[in-house]
Amino acid sequence: YRLKGETYKEKCSRVANALKDSDEHYQAFRDTLLNQRFLPGGRVQSAVGAPREITPYNCLTGDTKIITSDGVMTMLDANDQGVVTLIDGNGDWVQAGVFEHGTQETFDVTITNAGKKTFVVGATADHAWVVHGSDDRIKTADLKPGTKIPHMAVKPESDALAVMHGLIYGDGCATKDNGYVLHVCAEHEQTYPVLDNFSIPYSKTDRGRMYYLFGKNIHTSYKSLPPHGASPEYVAGFIRGVFLADGCLTKQPEYIITGCDSLKSWLETYGPIAGFYVTGASKLSAVTNYGTRTRDTYNIRFDLRTITQDDCLKGDYSYIVKHNEWSVKAVTYRGLEVVYCPSVPTTQSFLLANGMLSGNCFVSQIIEDSMDSIMDA
């Protein structure tokens, strides 16, 4: 890990110089290195103090939320877990360690979606941001207003049982004999195939069909939310089923699901696993034409950029807006904070909870894939 023409002693002095703010620490660390009582990781030895543009740790604050197979979690919680399965820059689920990198100066990067949705990410000055339409990455310190950050979603196919689960959760009723009934009006006939696919018995009414679920037709607790650990396919199917029961696609345009606090919280935590990003919710009036609601109810809105035809089991998909990226609005100093970052082995990038693609930290410069470049580095 010595640089070209560098002696072992010179290498130890260079690495120890990372603690140059304290001569006592510098001397103690240099002595430790010289006597080989401790050796840092090879990438650190080759990069720290090297006369080339490198960035030892490019990290994010602990409150930054990322998408994992266990749902959305903060970087701090991911670090406590140690290894998580997250979504890389190719849209693949991969395992990655999440590491703490000490206390560093951080900055608030304010990101906006065409001025409608704004959020803040805390990052170090050297954090490498993936930029839309470019293979190059930009440091936090070099971000400008208007810099475009890619927006992504992984949209799996629906688990058929999950669609039925979501449909009954949203519009069905539990019976005293541990079964379920669901009345589907004729104007919602697009719902029929979801239930007919499982040969659910029904009777005709003057308004449509009344479906009855009992015995072998009950595969789960249909009036409960999917459990922790549900697959992306199950999450996708459930959300699409709830939309079919209690959702609407408006000309504003908006993709909306109506639900209670627990559904809202579940969608915020697990929706991103299937590419559904909640952007907000408005509380509905407690008083309705049918009386007073027994619990708080919300219109829950989703980011339209990742809504697909498969998500729209009813409504006119042509209302959906075209894809657009996140845009940097401002960068301001935040202060000293403990920072964290995953180490993604495939793309050195991963998805944040809102679908924004972020780079991860690295400790050596990017070099060309050739033996000459490797030897020169």
Label each residue range with its predicted role:
Residues 60-94, 319-324:
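Long, charge-dense accessory insertions within large macromolecular proteins
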Residues 7, 69-78, 137-141, 231:
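Short, structural beta-strand-to-alpha-helix junction motif
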Residues 43, 61, 81, 98-288, ...:
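Intein-associated homing endonuclease modules of the LAGLIDADG/DOD-type, together
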Residues 1-63, 143-147, 155, 159, ...:
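Extended catalytic cores of very large enzyme megasubunits
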Residues 69-70, 87-90, 151-154, 171, ...:
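Fold-independent oxyanion-binding glycine-rich loops
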Residues 217-224, 288-323, 331:
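Long, continuous compositionally biased terminal/linker segments
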